[in-house]
């Protein structure tokens, strides 16, 4: 007889929870709610404290504080009880003495400031005398709102010298600079780990870290800007174009967006290859982010002998970087993957946040003057004044709490738990005509080249929806459902904001270069996001993403469309082949014929596109919501992760006039490290077929798309990253 299975220790855990309570095991499965998840992190931290020789039960620890922060908005009774229990402990228990908190699955307290080490002030005293001779020559470079930074003459650029300041003297902002400021407050991690949980389930933990550079915004003001990217400036007459008008209004803000919502931020190419080849489904689990090792520097410029210019960089211990997290999703949602402005895809290369801006309502009146020639046709675009009915102007300062970080500080977002539907990582080859049982054959073939015969169509059994016809054929048989759908392609919607293209669900390519008619997505991107670093010129690199043939249930090369309604078995002249002309087109497109989006339609999520594709998206706040989004495969059923904003606090000079239209600022910039943890839940793909399946792999064939040289650096470090296949393995839909 087999020994009984060992049960996990539950401890004193109330009903409905797995970890909220003392004495339980750390392997109880998935937490039941966010409070239980916080309790699991708390238990893991306690376990690490005990292993390091410390007693967290008698002392108040950072893990206790983190649990308080994570349960402050708890709606469940257990989370509320635990929250107030540890608040009481904080009031009476002594603080746990520790130099560094043991590593756990959680995050540290937001905005906690590290005390500067004593050697900083020693360095300041030593450097003060060295810089005394330079102080009289230093001139503070100022910037005015809406003006460019003063730049030296490019003709003497080769004579410029840039160096760091010696030691740590006082900078223009009153802070201390130079010489080893602060203490490291985090780790730099870009690994992807796989934890196999049993029953085919896998927990994928993607770590990502980047060094970010944040400069001063051109202005400290919010600006409502009207954009005209065309030959005519102002509100004049515009020549007819190809729906390329960029006219709109936007609110430009002095803030920047730290956006990690792209596959290339989290996975290296080999991880993507492993996941696509090995996993059957994928779903988002949780996200946490952290900013640490903040360094704020000021720049002063002095003139040496002749025209030699010297820039001096000083660490500023009192200047600050402002951080805001829109955890309630109040502000306009602007995912940066759609403009290729997420964090860069190369962990060893510094990157920058994206300037934050959002659309603003703009009343417009379009009138067209027709002409026999395209050149003579003109469109008059009249832009009206803002309307009270639709105007929405948001400021971050009035909407969100803002944390001020100085050199050495850190900020954490806490853990966000996703609520999304799983994504299949396999594709389907089955169309409607591959559903249900097949007709029986009369005789088996007698040779490998022979074909089989079916029973005469008038003698077959089965159901059809054709009246007064006794035939039962493959074309006439009823099927359980419709696989795949499309919307009319090449359609432009128009409203007060102007025309825009209707999203199209991807299908396979019908003919030639006709990608857009079947929902192919065009990506334009720069060197931070996969463009060849050796490429010259300003034009971005581009590629077109086509879904795998029949991934949406349509394979035009192997199917046909019949005229409707069907009353008799169709003649050849009633069958539309892909070579037939429809509506003046030289090739056949299903989207010219019908729109099959209805209650009988079954269809997959859009492809996850590596590396440039967006991962998750925000659900539209309307009563009737779309069943999918074209731009991302995961749609959050509640609020998505809050947008993370950063902004350098204005570093003012002594020349400040509150009534002036300009603000005199010390030239300041910041570097800081960003770190994130994105967790997924995946299901291993079972091996079912006799034949080997198609896999994503590389080769050494010259000019091959999957030539491994694409993902290897050159002698000077140049490289680029092309998109990798997704959903390579087929699965049975029915």
UniProtKB/Swiss-Prot annotation:
The alphabetized UniProt keywords are: Capsid protein, Clathrin-mediated endocytosis of virus by host, Cytoplasmic inwards viral transport, Host nucleus, Host-virus interaction, Magnesium, Metal-binding, Microtubular inwards viral transport, T=1 icosahedral capsid protein, Viral attachment to host cell, Viral penetration into host cytoplasm, Viral penetration into host nucleus, Viral penetration via permeabilization of host membrane, Virion, Virus endocytosis by host, Virus entry into host cell
Q: Is the Endoplasmic reticulum keyword given for this protein?
A: no
Q: Where is this region: Phospholipase A2-like?
A: 19-64
Per UniProt, the short sequence motif Nuclear localization signal occupies residue numbers 4-13
Write down the InterPro entries for this protein, in alphabetical order: Capsid/spike_ssDNA_virus, Parvovirus_coat, Phospholipase_A2-like, VP1/VP2
Q: Where is the composition biased (Polar residues)?
A: 25-35, 97-107, 140-153
Protein's cellular compartments: Virion; Host nucleus
Q: Which residues form a coiled coil?
A: none
Q: Which residues bind Mg(2+)?
A: 328
An annotated GO cellular component: T=1 icosahedral viral capsid
Sorted alphabetically, the Gene Ontology BP terms of this entry are: clathrin-dependent endocytosis of virus by host cell; microtubule-dependent intracellular transport of viral material towards nucleus; symbiont entry into host cell via permeabilization of host membrane; viral penetration into host nucleus; virion attachment to host cell
Write one Gene Ontology MF term.
metal ion binding
Here the segments flagged for biased composition (Basic residues) are 1-10
Keyword match Cytoplasm: no
* One Pfam family linked to the record: Parvo_coat
Spans annotated as Disordered: 1-42, 95-116, 134-154
Which family does this protein fall into?
Belongs to the parvoviridae capsid protein family.
Domain comment in the entry:
The N-terminus of VP1 is sequestered within the mature capsid. It contains a phospholipase A2-like region and putative nuclear localization signals.
Q: What does this protein do?
A: Capsid protein self-assembles to form an icosahedral capsid with a T=1 symmetry, about 22 nm in diameter, and consisting of 60 copies of two size variants of the capsid proteins, VP1 and VP2, which differ by the presence of an N-terminal extension in the minor protein VP1. The capsid encapsulates the genomic ssDNA. Capsid proteins are responsible for the attachment to host cell receptors. This attachment induces virion internalization predominantly through clathrin-dependent endocytosis.
Entry protein name: Capsid protein VP1
Q: What is the lineage of its organism?
A: Viruses, Monodnaviria, Shotokuvirae, Cossaviricota, Quintoviricetes
């Amino acid at each position: 007889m087999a020994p009984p299975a060992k049960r996990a220790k539950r401890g004193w855990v109330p009903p409905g929870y797995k970890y909220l309570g003392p004495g339980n095991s750390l392997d109880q499965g998935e937490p039941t709610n966010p409070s239980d998840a916080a309790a699991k992190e708390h238990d893991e931290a306690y376990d690490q404290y005990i292993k390091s020789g410390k007693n967290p039960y008698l002392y108040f620890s950072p893990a206790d504080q983190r649990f308080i922060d994570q349960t402050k908005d708890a709606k469940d009774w257990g989370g509320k009880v635990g929250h107030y229990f540890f608040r009481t402990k904080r009031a009476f228990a002594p603080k746990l003495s520790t130099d560094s908190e043991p590593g756990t699955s959680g995050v540290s307290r937001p905005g906690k400031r590290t005390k500067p080490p004593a050697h900083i002030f020693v360095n300041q005293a030593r450097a003060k005398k060295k810089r005394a001779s330079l102080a009289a020559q230093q001139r503070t470079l100022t910037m005015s709102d809406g003006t460019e930074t003063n730049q030296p003459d490019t003709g003497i650029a080769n004579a410029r010298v840039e160096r760091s300041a010696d030691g740590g003297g006082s900078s223009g902002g009153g802070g201390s600079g130079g010489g080893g400021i602060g203490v490291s407050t985090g780790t730099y991690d870009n690994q992807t780990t796989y934890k196999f949980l049993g029953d085919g389930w896998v927990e994928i933990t993607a770590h990502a870290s980047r060094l970010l550079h944040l400069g001063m915004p051109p202005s400290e003001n919010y600006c409502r800007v009207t954009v005209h990217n065309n030959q005519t400036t102002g509100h004049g007459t515009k020549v007819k174009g190809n729906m390329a008008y960029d006219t709109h209004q936007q609110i430009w803000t002095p803030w920047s967006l730290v956006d990690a919502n792209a596959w290339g931020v989290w996975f290296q190419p080999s991880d993507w290859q492993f996941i696509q080849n090995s996993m059957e489904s994928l779903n988002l689990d949780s996200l946490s982010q952290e900013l640490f090792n903040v360094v704020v520097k000021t720049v002063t410029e002095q003139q040496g002998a002749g025209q030699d210019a010297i820039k001096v960089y000083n660490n500023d211990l009192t200047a600050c970087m402002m951080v805001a997290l829109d955890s309630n999703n109040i502000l306009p949602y602007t995912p940066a993957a759609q403009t290729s402005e997420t964090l860069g895809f190369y962990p060893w290369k510094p990157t920058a946040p994206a300037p934050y801006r959002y659309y603003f309502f703009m009343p417009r009146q379009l009138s067209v003057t027709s002409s026999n020639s395209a050149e003579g046709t003109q469109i008059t675009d009249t832009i009206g004044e803002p309307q009270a009915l639709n105007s929405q102007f948001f400021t971050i300062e009035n909407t969100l709490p803002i944390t001020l970080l100085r050199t050495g500080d850190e900020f954490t977002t806490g853990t966000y738990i996703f609520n999304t539907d799983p994504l299949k990582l396999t594709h389907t080859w089955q169309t409607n005509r591959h559903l249900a049982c097949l007709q029986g054959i009369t005789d088996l073939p007698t040779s490998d080249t022979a074909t089989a015969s079916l029973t005469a169509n008038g003698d077959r059994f089965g159901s059809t929806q054709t009246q007064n016809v006794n035939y039962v054929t493959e074309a006439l048989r009823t099927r359980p459902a419709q696989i795949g759908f499309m919307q009319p392609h090449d359609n432009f919607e128009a409203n007060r904001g102007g025309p825009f293209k209707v999203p199209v669900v991807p299908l396979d390519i019908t003919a030639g270069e006709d990608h857009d008619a079947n929902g192919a997505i065009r990506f334009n991107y720069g060197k931070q996001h996969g463009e060849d670093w050796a490429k010259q010129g300003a034009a971005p690199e581009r590629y077109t993403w086509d879904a795998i043939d029949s991934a949406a249930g349509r394979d035009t090369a192997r199917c046909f469309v019949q005229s409707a309604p069907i009353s008799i078995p169709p003649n050849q002249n009633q069958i539309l082949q892909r070579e037939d002309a429809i509506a003046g087109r030289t090739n056949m497109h299903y989207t010219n014929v019908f729109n099959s989006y209805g209650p009988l339609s079954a269809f997959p999520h859009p492809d996850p596109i590596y590396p440039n594709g967006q991962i998750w998206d925000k659900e539209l706040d309307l009563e009737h919501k779309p069943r999918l989004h074209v731009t991302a495969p995961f749609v959050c059923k509640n609020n998505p992760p809050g947008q993370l904003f950063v902004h350098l606090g204005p570093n003012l000079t002594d020349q400040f006039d509150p009534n002036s239209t300009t603000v005199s600022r010390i030239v300041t910039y910041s570097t800081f490290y960003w770190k994130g943890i994105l967790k997924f839940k995946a299901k291993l793909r079972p091996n079912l077929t006799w034949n080997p399946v198609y896999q994503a792999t590389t080769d050494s064939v010259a000019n091959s798309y999957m030539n491994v040289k694409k993902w290897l650096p050159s002698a000077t470090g140049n490289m680029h990253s092309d998109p990798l296949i997704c959903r390579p393995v087929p699965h049975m839909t029915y």
